[in-house]
Every structure is written in structure tokens, then in C-alpha cells.
Amino acid sequence: MQGKFDKIANITLVMKTLDNNLPFNLQIENQLFSSGYELVAGGDEAGRGPVAGPVVAAIVVIKPGIYIPEVDDSKKLSSKKREKLFEEIINLVTDWSVAVVGPDLIDRLNIYQATKFAFKAALDSLSIKPEALILDALKLTGFSGKQVSMVKADEISFAVACASILAKVIRDKIMEQYDKDFPGYGFKKNKGYLTREHREALELLGPSPIHRKSFEPIKSFYGQLKLFEKV
């Protein structure tokens, strides 16, 4: 229980020191800038929950003075708005990187470890290395700089919100291509999430090559298949 109270206390401390003259979602970055960190990164992912397709991690690096007022958590924006902001973000930020981890590695590692793997790959791909990194309720091993881990960071950090938009737009494009490669599952619409129509397609067609075998109901499908093969 003490750990939970410590986290609440830390978040409360951050909130108390916010500058009302700054945009709310730039407060954390500005605290880091004020502490001497000149290159601050935010990371976010898309695709942890779906039963099909990859998990995509994005990292965005910013310097003081970089800001786009319209940027928000990607889930709060329309597809059209995300795509518009995508172009603005990649043209304005100091550096950015995206890593894609497919279903096979997700099944091998588990989704949590696969997500961390994607973040590490994105971090390693950056041309400009950040001095501080903000993530949503996650910490990475091997990063020597300052790390800030906060729940719902995509709602209160500009850099993380930028990363959430990049990850979401790129993953959506991947799923739209998969909709053409594997028709019948509705990937363009459901993006791999288990909607009623998606479940019905699974019952009719069986899993596709991009379905995650470690996720239900696909896991049970392959379990039943093994039992059938033994009979």
C-alpha cells in the first residue's frame, strides 16, 4: 500500500508546482527544461489491447519552444485530425522514431515485454538522444537519463501526446493494409480489437496470420486444434 501512496504523493507534488501561465500539457516538460534537461522525450504506444496486429511504440524528442496547441491524447482526436497533426509533429519536433513489433514476437514475449521491446527499439533508432524521457506508467531499463513515469501521461504531457498520435496513425495505416491482405475480419474498421463482428468473423474464418495466438479467443482456438489433432 505504501507504494501506492508514494505515487499519489509524487503526482500531487507535481500538480502543486504547475505554472498556470503554461499550457497544461506542457507543464511536465517545462519542469524538466527548468531543471537543466534540454532534450526531453515522450513515448507512447498503440495496439496493446487488440487481438490482431502489431503493437507500435513512438518516441518524440522536443526542445524548449516547441509546441502545437491542437495536440492532445490521440484517442480524443478524429482520424482526420490525427493525420493532419502527424505531419505537423514530424516536421516540427527535434527528432522522432517509431518501432513496430508484430504478433509473433508479442506471442513469444507477452504484450507487456513486447511493448517495452518496441520502446527500446524506438529509443535506439533516434538520431538525437534525449536527456529525459516521459512514459505512461512504464519505465525502461538501459536508459541512463532521467525517467518520468506517470499514469495517463498522454493526457498531461505534450511530448507523450505527440508520440500517441504518431503511434496511432502508423498502426491504423498498417491495419488498413492488413484489411486488404486478410479480408473478412474488418481490420480497417476494428483495427484488430475484438468487436462482435470481428468475433463472428473469427468463428467463420478462423484466425488469420496476424492474430495473436496468446490472446483469447485465438488461444482457445489453437488449443482445441491441438486436441483435435491428437484424436
UniProtKB/Swiss-Prot annotation:
The keyword Hydrolase applies. The keyword Repeat does not apply. GO terms for molecular function: manganese ion binding; RNA binding; RNA-DNA hybrid ribonuclease activity. It catalyses: Endonucleolytic cleavage to 5'-phosphomonoester. Pfam families: RNase_HII. GO terms for biological process: DNA replication, removal of RNA primer; mismatch repair. Gene3D superfamilies: Ribonuclease H-like superfamily/Ribonuclease H. Its EC number is 3.1.26.4. Its main location: cytoplasm. Manganese or magnesium. Binds 1 divalent metal ion per monomer in the absence of substrate. May bind a second metal ion after substrate binding. Keywords: Cytoplasm, Endonuclease, Hydrolase, Manganese, Metal-binding, Nuclease. It is found in: Cytoplasm. Residues 38-227 form the RNase H type-2 domain. GO terms for cellular component: cytoplasm; ribonuclease H2 complex. Its cofactor is Mn(2+); Mg(2+). A divalent metal cation binds at D44, E45, D136. Signal peptide: none annotated. It comes from the Bacteria. Endonuclease that specifically degrades the RNA of RNA-DNA hybrids. Belongs to the RNase HII family. This is Ribonuclease HII. It comes from Carboxydothermus hydrogenoformans (strain ATCC BAA-161 / DSM 6008 / Z-2901).
